């Protein structure tokens, strides 16, 4: 689980664009591996997961697809991530 891999698209959903409000998140991100590319295959898999789960944002679906196979997703949004992970290959969900 450590260090966490964080796709860059997650930054858009987790940051506010304000240094003061983002300070704690930025401290956490310094401990992470930031993944800046998503392959076409992973993007297609994310689209498939969204179709199968019938819920979740594109970013959530990409996070779950990147975690395949056998990864763990850390989230504060259990419902959508678990719905997507239910169709993924051995992806577990931990709520933080």
Where are the model-predicted features located?
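Flexible glycine-rich beta->alpha loop in the catalytic core of nucleotide-sugar glycosyltransferases
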Residues: 79
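Acidic beta-strand-to-loop metal/phosphate-binding motif
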Residues: 73-76
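PIN-domain endoribonuclease scaffold, especially VapC-family toxins
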Residues: 1-71, 82-96
């Amino acid at each position: 689980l450590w260090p966490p891999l964080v796709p860059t698209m997650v930054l858009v959903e987790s940051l506010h664009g304000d240094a003061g409000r983002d300070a704690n998140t930025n401290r956490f991100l310094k401990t992470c591996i930031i993944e800046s590319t998503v392959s076409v295959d992973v993007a297609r898999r994310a689209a498939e997961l969204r179709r199968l789960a019938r819920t979740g944002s594109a970013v959530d679906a990409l996070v779950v697809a990147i975690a395949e196979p056998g990864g763990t997703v850390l989230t504060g949004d259990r419902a959508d991530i678990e719905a997507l992970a239910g169709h993924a290959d051995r992806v577990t969900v931990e709520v933080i």
